[in-house]
A protein has these predicted regions:
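Asp-box/WD-like beta-propeller blade repeats and closely related beta-sheet repeat scaffolds
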Residues: 87-93, 109-175
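Blade-edge beta-strand/turn elements of extracellular beta-propeller
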Residues: 32-42, 75-87, 143-169, 202-242, ...
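Residue-level signature of beta-propeller blades and closely related beta-rich strand-turn architectures
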Residues: 64, 108-110, 192, 263, ...
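Short, conserved, GDST-rich strand-edge loop motifs in beta-rich repeat architectures
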Residues: 104-134, 219-220, 258-273, 319-338, ...
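A short loop-to-beta-strand structural motif that recurs across blades of beta-propeller domains
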Residues: 66-69, 133-138, 195-198, 207, ...
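Secretory targeting and sorting signals
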Residues: 1-28
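Beta-propeller domains
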Residues: 59-80
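Beta-rich, blade/repeat-based domains predominating
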Residues: 41-57, 86-101, 106-108, 157-186, ...
Length: 390
């Protein structure tokens, strides 16, 4: 696993998602009203995956690999109904497909060698669960004992290497983002493969689009690092190529497919893009040097470390792991735990970013929208929550 995608698994732990009393700060280059402080729907443990189904029902995943249905009640606290689990050390992505099928996506991280948590609750007649395979799309249906493997994303990427890879790992795979389509197929954003894949209802995989690297400048304010920690870093302002790192995918209100980028090292703030891809596309290229041509065109720019996308009637929403960047979080820089949530609205001939819940989210992991309600999960490690914004 390369350095950038490893950061998605090892982002620093924090203890709360809502920051009490923190004054909103102006976000440079971003405009629009800030929504009210998020409301806690229910406490969760290191949540990430979220699929808001409407009528107060939301699918979520947590750090132990479990997936549950959160049911909001008019009078009383929300109820969390466990549905199943994958033995993994990072919460999978989740999406509800047709006929009650739940899709779950594991990344490059798989189950821990020794699952002390599971072993501690096993009885003499029980068998410790096998670690879930990494880089795999699973599906689960009501009545099934456990999720079943459906598509081996990692194996597919071995035969479909990234031609623009910058880290000598062209066959690397870390599927991270997931969206279920109405025809029974599934879209998968592979962070290490820098591409968007489509898995059809039979489990066959095709490459929808490849996201090419972008030349960025090394940001100011990075500390000096010793060689054993990856240093020395290039001087600020040095232009270097940086991989896209496709983390997220959603279907927009216009039916188009939208893909979000984390941005590889040095994770320069403001260089993450959102791409718009025409439905049914195969073999497209998302090229920052020619962003307005072909079947993949740039929809938004100026974001930082995007980890999830969602769509509603008002447009596409982008969730940032950190407004300073994932690399700043990895370095432990002050304030780097603060994430961002933006509604990407149309503005003249382009788009405009409207921030929601300004400075109220810490290392968030997932976002989804139903009606006018925006649901956010996080932080990725430690005590967290499912939140509702709007």
């Amino acid at each position: 696993m390369n350095r950038t995608t490893a950061a998605l698994v090892t982002a620093g732990a924090v203890s709360a998602l809502v920051i009490p009393g923190l004054s909103p700060a102006a976000a440079g280059g971003h405009h629009g009203p800030s929504y009210d402080e998020p409301r806690v729907v229910t406490a969760l443990d290191g949540p990430r995956g979220v699929d808001a189904l409407g009528h107060g029902r939301t699918l979520v995943t947590e750090s132990d690999g479990s997936f549950s249905m959160v049911v909001e009640r008019r009078h009383g606290p929300a109820k969390v109904i466990g549905l199943g689990a994958l033995a993994t050390d990072f919460p999978p992505a989740v999406a509800l497909g047709r006929h009650g099928t739940v899709f779950l996506l594991t990344g490059a991280s798989s189950g821990p060698p020794e699952d002390a948590r599971a072993a501690s609750v096993l009885t003499a007649d029980e068998v410790e669960p096998e670690p879930a395979a990494g880089a795999t799309l699973y599906r689960w249906r009501p009545g099934w004992d456990a999720p079943r493997p459906f598509a081996d994303i990692g194996a597919y990427q071995v035969g479909d290497p990234d031609p623009a890879d910058l880290e000598d790992l062209p066959a690397d795979s870390n599927p991270f983002g997931l969206a279920a389509l109405a025809d029974g197929s599934v879209l998968v954003a592979d962070a290490a493969g820098n591409d968007l894949l489509r898995v059809d209802k039979h489990g066959d995989i095709t490459t929808v689009a490849r996201l090419l690297p972008r030349v960025v400048e090394v940001p100011e304010g990075l500390p000096e690092l010793p060689p054993e920690a990856g240093g020395p870093l290039p001087p600020a302002g040095t232009p270097i190529p940086s991989e896209a790192v496709a983390t997220s995918v959603t279907v927009g209100p216009d039916g188009a497919w939208y893909v979000g980028e984390l941005r590889g090292f040095p994770a320069t703030p403001g260089t993450s893009q959102v791409w718009r891809i025409k439905p049914g596309t195969v073999g497209a290229t998302c090229d920052p040097e020619a962003p307005w041509t072909g079947r993949c065109t740039r929809y938004a720019d100026g974001l930082t470390s995007v980890v999830d996308l969602a769509a509603g009637s008002r447009g596409v929403y982008a969730l940032e792991l950190s407004k300073q960047s994932w690399f700043a979080t990895e370095l432990g820089l002050p304030g780097s735990e603060i994430g961002g949530l933006y509604l990407i609205g149309k503005h003249r001939h382009g788009t405009r970013l409207h921030e929601l819940a300004t400075d109220r989210l810490l290392t968030p992991g997932g976002v989804d929208v139903v009606g006018r309600d925006v649901y956010v999960t996080g932080p990725l490690f430690g005590p967290g929550a499912l939140l509702r914004v709007g």
